[in-house]
Amino acid sequence: MKNKEREIIKIILRAYDHHLIDQAAKKIIDIVTKTGAQIEGPIPLPTKKEVFTVLRSPFVNKDSREQFERRTHKRLIQIVNPNNKTIESLMHINLPSAIDILLKK
């Protein structure tokens, strides 16, 4: 039996707006499928929720507080056996600046 090695590129997208991250994932998937590579995803990863508590008054009244939260949404896209055309098209993709992209091999 032959061991068929699969080369996988993992793309992790992070953003505060889930609509924006879904549009970016769709754009990446469209570009990669045009080059003939296989795709797994977008796989939704757990959303990170951060809560910040601040005092409302500048001096006294510690019982009066306000809470703010920030949610970071994540998506994972795996490109299986990419070719040179796939990598070249990923280098020239335009995505909004609100999206953080992490590439792993």
UniProtKB/Swiss-Prot annotation:
Gene Ontology biological process: translation
Domain of life: Bacteria
InterPro entries recorded: Ribosomal_uS10, Ribosomal_uS10_CS, Ribosomal_uS10_dom, Ribosomal_uS10_dom_sf
GO molecular function terms listed in the Swiss-Prot or TrEMBL record: structural constituent of ribosome; tRNA binding
Cellular component GO terms held in the UniProt record: ribonucleoprotein complex; ribosome
UniProt keyword annotations, A-Z: Ribonucleoprotein, Ribosomal protein
Record's subunit section: Part of the 30S ribosomal subunit.
Classification via HAMAP family: Ribosomal_uS10
Function: Involved in the binding of tRNA to the ribosomes.
Family: Belongs to the universal ribosomal protein uS10 family.
Name the record gives this protein: Small ribosomal subunit protein uS10
Organism expressing this protein natively: Phytoplasma australiense
Gene label: rpsJ
